[in-house]
């Protein structure tokens, strides 16, 4: 009988700690959910501004909303959209986001696979002549800030 009483006292102490752990986990879950919702809203918001002809997203929503470029559109924005879709909306990732990547490669590759700035209104490169320094800079930014994080998380590209 004494063993049962001691066991109950010990177990009640352990269960009190478990309740706190579950409360902490529930709070963390709510915060994670809020983060996922905000990231998903970010993707939805940017997709609403995609160029209707190409599906590509603009450099920004003010003075450069008419262009796509490697160092900003591709390097700083698109990877987070792709990762968010991969985590929160697999059909979006496997559909529109991969289509965007294919279109990007098709329309923006200027020197081999190295991309150059694309004009939505011209439906061609922004500059008539390639600028090697700009192309290398944009490509390096895209590789470093965009493609590397995607590859680290997603693995080999399709």
Model-identified regions with their sequence ranges:
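Hydrophobic h-region of N-terminal signal peptides that target proteins for export
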Residues: 8-16
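Glycan-recognition and catalytic cores of secretory/periplasmic carbohydrate-active enzymes
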Residues: 17-158
């Amino acid at each position: 009988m004494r063993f049962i009483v001691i066991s109950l006292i010990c177990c009640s102490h352990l269960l009190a700690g478990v309740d706190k752990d579950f409360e902490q986990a529930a709070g963390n879950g709510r915060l994670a959910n809020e983060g996922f919702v905000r990231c998903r809203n970010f993707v939805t918001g940017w997709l609403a501004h995609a160029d209707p002809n190409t599906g590509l997203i603009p450099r920004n929503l003010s003075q450069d909303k008419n262009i796509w470029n490697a160092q900003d559109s591709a390097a700083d924005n698109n990877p987070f959209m792709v990762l968010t879709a991969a985590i929160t909306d697999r059909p979006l990732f496997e559909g529109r986001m991969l289509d965007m990547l294919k279109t990007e490669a098709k329309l923006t590759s200027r020197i081999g696979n190295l991309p150059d700035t694309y004009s939505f209104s011209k439906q061609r490169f922004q500059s008539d002549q390639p600028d090697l320094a700009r192309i290398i800079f944009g490509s390096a930014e895209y590789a470093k800030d965009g493609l590397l994080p995607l590859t680290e998380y997603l693995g080999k590209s399709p």
